[in-house]
Amino acid sequence: YMDFTSGIGVTNTGHCHPKVVQAIQAQAETMIFGMVNIVISPATLALAESLDEVTPTTIDRFFFANSGAEAVEASVKLARHATRRRNIIVFQGSFHGRTAQAMAMTTSKTIYRYDYQPLPGGVVVAPFPYSFHYGWDDVQTTEFCMRQLDLLLKSQSAPEETAAIIIEPVLGEGGYVPAPLEFMQALRALCDAHDILLIVDEVQSGCGRTGKFFSFEHAGIEPDIIVMAKGLGSGLPISGIASRRELMEHWKPGTHGGTYGGGSAIVAAGALASVQVIREEHLVENAAKMGEHLQVGLRKLQEEHSVIGDVRGRGLMVGVEFTAPEGKPDAAIAKAVQQACLERNMLLLTCGSYDNVIRWIPPLIVNEQQIGQGLHIFAEALEKNNMT
């Protein structure tokens, strides 16, 4: 099979990259676990130092956990604790996890929240700048969404009670929608104006996925807190948050923690090797180049098939949105194409609130020939279903 899912954006270095495997094996022979409250393993220290090299200079403190949801919860706890404010602003269509607080912040599908009410409070939802959904260009969408945010701060959550705004720079489960760069810049300015922390959830878009090590870099901004997971460990369970010293120092010993976060030396060694592979093998640059090649091919197919309403993305985080003739979301078409690709040994996933978007998430090691093969299979899948 040709895996263009990467385990939902996890195996960025490919399956069983030799350097990652070797790091895991070597670490297992020396130390498996060291609780960070007692002893910090050399692997964990080296991982923090490696991440320090790829984060903004203002970001110099790291906390490790096991899953994306844990890291999101940690970012919210830190924001609330540091600011002494309670509310968190999230965006429509977001996915931040399945634990209680993260689930309360997730709005991409009702299934993630169904029958789990009541959920933790202090969460306010703002419109995400989804230009295709609105039928506008990015400038119009940005202006509208920023006006709505301003209204929200006047009507639902005053700045002095808003701890943070959290955003996925590329909406993940909500449809693989990149936030316009001008929106990210305006959002940073809004947070600065009101002393609100900006959290970027890079769980799916980070670690080279979009052609930058972190997706927020495309906008030339610096967040206050970065959330990372998935591609960080090449399949091992690790996540983390990164922030500034003055924010992290609000966490006194015992304020937050966990047994396994940063404690598993094997996981830390694998994550360190993953970061090294991404950098040494120039996978960030490859993601940018192959992503451009992929989108060019998909746009050619869009010209031939009217069921493809939109092709969008950054790097190797690309979404193809399917619509019916009247422009409404069409999940049936997306599922049929996905199944036809599976029958041809190519793995793809759907996403979006209407489940009408096929997402392309190949490993960052993918080459031009494999992209071409994937596009060929995708074209066959469209033709099999007589999609014009």
Where are these predicted regions, by residue range?
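Conserved N-terminal phosphate-binding loop of PLP-dependent enzymes in the Aspartate aminotransferase
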Residues: 1-388
